[in-house]
């Protein structure tokens, strides 16, 4: 059975935790393991933070869009902004690369996404925004609740 959720919110730093918790709550119906849930929450946090800090350069007028589709123990996430886009996607995907060193950003966001998810696709064009598509196959075993 397929189940979908769509979320739209202002590109404000304080909305990052809202996005993370909302996605985690929606995914909980598949009974993921704690590790799987933590990885997905971390990826959502990284992608949303990238949209706010880099995509909109903290311009509160922007919107962040999240779509989640659950189907047969697979989570499909799309996180999109309509910000400034990424001029050099290959460079941006390199570990430790950041365009905002003055903000003490680690430059590990895309690396974390690629390590925690089964598939990561990034589409971006300057002045057109960025769309990140992520796929995670959940284990069929049930989470243990003690």
From Swiss-Prot:
Q: Does the keyword Nucleotide-binding apply?
A: yes
Q: Name one Pfam family in it.
A: HATPase_c_2
| InterPro entries xrefs | Anti-sigma-factor_SerPK, Anti-sigma_F, HATPase_C_sf
Disulfide partners: none
Enzyme Commission numbers on file: 2.7.11.1
General function of this protein: Binds to sigma F and blocks its ability to form an RNA polymerase holoenzyme (E-sigma F). Phosphorylates SpoIIAA on a serine residue. This phosphorylation may enable SpoIIAA to act as an anti-anti-sigma factor that counteracts SpoIIAB and thus releases sigma F from inhibition.
- The protein's name: Anti-sigma F factor
Organism of origin is Bacillus velezensis (strain DSM 23117 / BGSC 10A6 / LMG 26770 / FZB42)
């Amino acid at each position: 059975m397929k189940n979908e959720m769509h979320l739209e919110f202002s590109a404000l730093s304080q909305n990052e935790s809202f996005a993370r918790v909302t996605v985690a709550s929606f995914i909980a119906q598949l009974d993921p393991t704690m590790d799987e849930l933590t990885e997905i929450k971390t990826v959502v946090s990284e992608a949303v933070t990238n949209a706010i800090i880099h995509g909109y350069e903290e311009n509160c007028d922007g919107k962040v869009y999240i779509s989640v589709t659950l189907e047969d123990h697979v989570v499909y996430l799309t996180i999109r902004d309509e910000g400034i886009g990424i001029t050099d996607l290959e460079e941006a995907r390199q570990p430790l690369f950041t365009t905002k060193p003055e903000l003490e950003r680690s430059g590990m966001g895309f690396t974390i996404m690629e390590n925690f998810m089964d598939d990561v696709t990034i589409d971006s064009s300057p002045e057109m925004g960025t769309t990140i598509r992520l796929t995670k196959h959940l284990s069929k075993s049930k989470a243990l609740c003690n």
